Amino acid sequence: MAHLKKNTRGAVPGLAVHFERKTDHHTNKEIDVSKTYLNQDLMADGSDMLSRFNARLNDVYCMKRDDVKALATWIVTLPEELTEAPYEQQSAFFEATTNFLNDRYGQENAVAAVVHYDETTPHLHYAFVPVVFDDKKSRDKVSAKEVLTRHDLQTFHE
């Protein structure tokens, strides 16, 4: 199962806290802190989600408005047939999913790929800045509307 959400700039710090488990006081009661050590950061490059997000926004044009959807997040849950599979096999599924999403939306636009094993169902949080090339202005720009079209969503599971 996969779920997409478009987020404004204002939502990014809160998402980063959740994705990277930067607090000990979780509002989500489903989080089992004894399993948090199992979580995986598939973008372990030494920086955090917020830094990667801000760095990518500095590289592309983004309108300075509060309502601009500057970040898109996919949540991909582990398929039922893999729930009893070994950790390594589950991990391989999430790595393959991350590679698929990087190919689809551009690895340079990815700002987070975190697997949570400490909640009820293991799942991947994949966050990226939706970027397209603006032919009129000859530059990259943020546009969730142009990246995440109905056609993109319809062909996602193919």
Residue ranges and their predicted role:
Residues 1-158:
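N-terminal nicking endonuclease/strand-transfer module with a His-rich metal-binding environment
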